[in-house]
Regions:
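Long, contiguous binding/interaction regions
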Residues: 1-24, 28-29, 43-53, 69-73, ...
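A common structural junction motif
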Residues: 18, 56-61
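A short, glycine/Asx- and small/polar-enriched loop/turn
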Residues: 32-35, 82-84
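Flexible interhelical turns and helix-capping residues at alpha-helix boundaries
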Residues: 41-44, 63
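Active-site phosphate-binding and catalytic loops of NTP-dependent enzymes
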Residues: 61-70
Length: 123
């Protein structure tokens, strides 16, 4: 699976658990470490855990993909899933605001999802 498809799939899986304000940043021209960041907000520790579990378990079950590394505490405020070409950041809103990844990587184009939950519900 190419890195853009993986980023979109990670976004979709996070959306399945109602992650908020999900953004995909295309950092291919800005970083030699990864191609895409997926940034999502969870509203509580259990919500963060549910999002992280959905992404890791579904990628493992459906695509035999496991993160190279998992950083942060599942019961904490920020968890990072490193899939090499895609890095998924799941964080509480206050932590996301404090560190401002989108501002830090403001030169990175945003990738539009195939379908958002709101548009899918409207159909």
């Amino acid at each position: 699976m190419d890195s853009k498809k993986l980023a979109l799939l990670c976004r979709e899986l996070a959306d399945n658990k109602k992650a908020e304000d999900i953004v995909i940043l295309d950092v291919r021209k800005l970083s030699s470490v990864t191609d895409y960041f997926v940034v999502a907000t969870g509203t509580s520790e259990p919500h963060l855990r549910a999002i992280v579990t959905e992404v890791t378990e579904q990628l493992k079950a459906d695509h035999h993909l496991r993160p190279n590394a998992v950083e942060g505490d599942m019961g904490g405020a920020w968890v990072v899933l490193d899939f090499f070409d895609v890095i998924v950041h799941v964080m509480r809103g206050d932590v996301r605001e404090k560190y401002g990844l989108e501002e830090l990587w403001s030169d990175a184009p945003r990738v539009k999802p195939r379908r958002a939950r709101a548009s899918a519900a409207a159909e």
